[in-house]
Amino acid sequence: MSTNRRRLVILVADSAGCGALPDAAAYGDEGSDTLGNTSRAVGGLSLPVLGRMGLGHVTAIQGVPPDPAPTAFHGRMAERSEGKDTTTGHWEMMGVVLREGLRTFPRGFPPEILEAFVRETGAPGVLGNTVASGTVIIQELGEEHQRTGKPIVYTSADSVFQVAAHTDTVPLETLYAWCRTARRILDPWRVARVIARPFVGTPGSYARTYDRKDFSMPPPAPTVLERLVEAGVPVVGVGKIPDIFDRRGITEEIHTAGNADGLARTAALLDRVDRGLVFVNLVDFDMLYGHRNDPAGYARALEELDRGLPAILDRLGPGELLALTADHGCDPTTPSTDHSREHVPLIVHAPGRGGGDLGTRATFADLGATVAEYFGVRSEVGTSFLAEVTR
């Protein structure tokens, strides 16, 4: 390992928002506060590491009071783009702000999309075509799917075309091929993501697997990731990061099977990588607990993150940075099972630098601007806070 290490780690706690944005009511999300409401629903959280880093300053979290002398810099970021989904949030982090929201289909997909999908994939038809919870719809339609071979197609409040299939009925590679075809069909419709949703099990006890795969629209403009790669800076995408950016601006991909695996792989990665950006998505918060309105599970996942952080923090030295944030909210305490329009936390660990208040940032793109300045590449969107965390 080189003694001249220069690494920046971004951990995205997927959906861990910290309070409704001013326009949240327009999205049906007034009062949402994923971290705060989760803490109160379970009678308090135990997050000693994150608490010392200053997480208690970003919103009122039961069990995590504001630390008077935090060890990291703390703040929160507001989303400037229209929307509240994974793609929009991650793209904005890396400097692409969407002025027009990506298209959603609250009444299902029109016949011309489904007819093209069936014709071009050779699938025997589709089931569903509705807004649904993925874990619910596979229980409702899984048996019919296995009997007919028809994939289950559904969407949500986000810009997604989701295709669920049992791995014994539709082999994984066939499902991926169908989703690649759907991606091509849906590009003109401005659908952010096509998501392959494989599942296993028997009627009444179907379960989704970690072999989900996202097929994203390419970002409409160059991201900070692409500029890093052009400048020769390695960019390692961990979890679903490569999928979100259509693999643009990624030099290495690491697949994960949940948050614990993602944290362990990130720590191991830091033992062999001495330069570049390590960009990590931890999806369990959103996939397993937020959408399922499970505050107890969400709380356990936050505590798991807290336990896993030291192994990563201990591998970073002077001049290196770690930023912990989120891409949107998904408050498990509200009636909705969809994402919520929220601020996201910003916790920045700069070894040897202590902590301080970064305030409320006007856009997620401030993070990308900071990454760009750290590695010496340009960015047009956002205001870097690098000087504030390295002074």
Curated annotation (Swiss-Prot):
Mn(2+) 2 binds at D286, H291, H339. Its EC number is 5.4.2.7. Its cofactor is Mn(2+). GO terms for biological process: 2-deoxyribose 1-phosphate catabolic process; 5-phosphoribose 1-diphosphate biosynthetic process; metabolic compound salvage; nucleotide metabolic process. Residues 76-87 have a biased composition (Basic and acidic residues). Residues 61-88 are annotated as: Disordered. It is an enzyme of class 5 (isomerase). It catalyses: 2-deoxy-alpha-D-ribose 1-phosphate = 2-deoxy-D-ribose 5-phosphate; alpha-D-ribose 1-phosphate = D-ribose 5-phosphate. It is found in: Cytoplasm. It holds the Pfam family Metalloenzyme. Isomerase that catalyzes the conversion of deoxy-ribose 1-phosphate (dRib-1-P) and ribose 1-phosphate (Rib-1-P) to deoxy-ribose 5-phosphate (dRib-5-P) and ribose 5-phosphate (Rib-5-P), respectively. PANTHER family: PHOSPHOPENTOMUTASE (PTHR21110:SF0). This is Phosphopentomutase. It comes from Anaeromyxobacter dehalogenans (strain 2CP-C). The lineage of its organism: Bacteria, Pseudomonadati, Myxococcota, Myxococcia, Myxococcales.
